[in-house]
UniProtKB/Swiss-Prot annotation:
<dbReference type="InterPro" id="IPR020843">
    <property type="entry name" value="PKS_ER"/>
</dbReference>
<keyword id="KW-0479">Metal-binding</keyword>
<comment type="function">
    <text>Xylitol dehydrogenase which catalyzes the conversion of xylitol to D-xylulose. Xylose is a major component of hemicelluloses such as xylan. Most fungi utilize D-xylose via three enzymatic reactions, xylose reductase (XR), xylitol dehydrogenase (XDH), and xylulokinase, to form xylulose 5-phosphate, which enters pentose phosphate pathway.</text>
</comment>
<protein>
    <recommendedName>
        <fullName>Probable D-xylulose reductase A</fullName>
        <ecNumber>1.1.1.9</ecNumber>
    </recommendedName>
</protein>
<dbReference type="GO" id="GO:0003939">
    <property type="term" value="F:L-iditol 2-dehydrogenase (NAD+) activity"/>
</dbReference>
<dbReference type="GO" id="GO:0042732">
    <property type="term" value="P:D-xylose metabolic process"/>
</dbReference>
<keyword id="KW-0560">Oxidoreductase</keyword>
<dbReference type="GO" id="GO:0019569">
    <property type="term" value="P:L-arabinose catabolic process to xylulose 5-phosphate"/>
</dbReference>
<feature type="binding site">
    <location>
        <position position="73"/>
    </location>
    <ligand>
        <name>Zn(2+)</name>
    </ligand>
</feature>
<keyword id="KW-0119">Carbohydrate metabolism</keyword>
<dbReference type="Pfam" id="PF08240">
    <property type="entry name" value="ADH_N"/>
</dbReference>
<dbReference type="Pfam" id="PF00107">
    <property type="entry name" value="ADH_zinc_N"/>
</dbReference>
<dbReference type="GO" id="GO:0006062">
    <property type="term" value="P:sorbitol catabolic process"/>
</dbReference>
<dbReference type="InterPro" id="IPR002328">
    <property type="entry name" value="ADH_Zn_CS"/>
</dbReference>
<comment type="pathway">
    <text>Carbohydrate degradation; L-arabinose degradation via L-arabinitol; D-xylulose 5-phosphate from L-arabinose (fungal route): step 4/5.</text>
</comment>
<dbReference type="InterPro" id="IPR013149">
    <property type="entry name" value="ADH-like_C"/>
</dbReference>
<comment type="similarity">
    <text>Belongs to the zinc-containing alcohol dehydrogenase family.</text>
</comment>
């Protein structure tokens, strides 16, 4: 991996090709709008999408054609403010929402800006990410962190925002039963948000015993490790073990795995709600007969929208959701490539990359 030989001003972690990354000094970003701020990035979490771009150079139709700075799960300190900024000042600690919509299209005006076709999302081609010393954002996409939330925790507002959006899509009511497939960071956070929303039974499902053990200590009320049997058989076993009666009220799939989708549809009660939050293959087989005859409500979930980031911050500030326990490693900026390799190998739950030192 190449490194810059000059004193860096805005050192950035750049993906040039599959498994080809380098540290590159780039210009310090300028304020593009009076309402913008420049953030000195302090911590960035490694997301599965970052690793996927590093591993494959593309996610679906998003293809890395030019060198791209990685990273989008970040927190930092405001370093500069535009002339029209009123809600932030230099020195404020913030969580950084990394996708900026056009604000003018129909989805934006309807409050669903996560569906904006002109979304400029960090580390999604052709837009650079946040693994740099400085990053520009509109002030309203920076969320001031209360004193009881650290900058490390602030970096986890991004995956928590994803989990908040997924869980809000499910419209969970107090006392309901929820099954969450996939005990990675987002699935674990979905369990935590479901608990904060009042779910009485939260069953985490995964094929990795270590993840299930963590889920049980973290936010799940029960865990389930699928056997190598049919989806119907696993669903029946889950219902019986957890006294779900006719089935779960809500299923959240945070895995994207086809067997999870099938089991999730079968474990739901008639009239239940299914939310697909995890992305897997572009196309899978789907149990359409079971979905129709049980008249399920089926929803997708993509990133986060209006109010999700703010709620994420509020949930942590109030103590209703704990994100600190998910942080299993913090590395220096210069160790970013090795950290990507370890995340790819499945080490830890959430690894953070510290910002460039002054």
């Amino acid at each position: 991996m190449a490194t810059s030989s000059t004193t860096p001003q805005n050192l950035s972690f750049v993906l040039e090709g599959i498994h080809q990354v380098k540290f590159e000094d780039r210009p310090i970003p300028e304020l593009r709008d009076p309402h913008d701020v420049i953030v000195n990035v302090k911590y960035t979490g490694i997301c599965g999408s970052d690793v996927h771009y590093w591993e494959h150079g593309a996610i679906g139709h998003f293809v890395v054609k030019d060198p791209m700075v990685l990273g989008h799960e970040s927190s930092g300190v405001v370093a500069k403010v535009g002339s029209a900024v009123t809600s932030l000042k230099v020195g404020d600690r913030v969580a950084m929402e990394p996708g900026v919509p056009c604000r003018r299209c129909e989805p934006c005006k309807a409050g669903k800006y996560n569906l904006c076709e002109k979304m400029a999302f960090a580390a999604t081609p052709p837009y650079d990410g946040t693994l740099a010393k400085y990053y520009p954002l509109p002030e309203d996409f920076c969320y001031k962190l209360p004193e009881n939330i650290s900058l490390q925790e602030g970096a986890l507002m991004e995956p928590l925002g994803v989990a908040v959006h997924i869980t809000r899509q499910a419209s969970i009511k107090p006392g309901e039963s929820v099954v969450v497939f996939g005990a990675g960071p987002v699935g674990l956070l979905c369990c935590a948000v479901a608990r904060a929303f009042g779910a009485s039974k939260i069953i985490a499902v995964d094929i990795q015993k270590t993840r299930l053990d963590f889920a049980k200590k973290y936010a799940a009320t029960a865990i389930f490790e699928p056997a190598k049997v049919s989806a119907v058989a696993n669903a029946d076993q889950m219902r019986e073990e957890n006294d779900l009666g006719p089935g779960a009220d809500v299923v959240i799939d945070a895995s994207g795995a086809e067997p999870s989708v099938h089991t999730g549809i079968h474990v739901l009660r008639p009239g239940g709600t299914y939310v697909q939050g995890g992305m897997g293959r572009n196309e899978i087989n789907f149990p359409i007969m079971a979905a129709c005859t049980k008249e399920l409500t089926i929803k997708g979930s993509f990133r986060y929208g209006s109010g999700d980031y703010k709620l994420a911050v509020d949930l942590v500030a109030s103590g209703k959701v704990n994100v600190k326990d998910l942080i299993t490693g913090v590395v220096e900026f210069q160790e970013a490539e090795q950290a990507f390799k370890e995340v790819k190998a499945g080490k830890g739950i959430k690894t953070l990359i510290a910002g460039v030192r002054d």
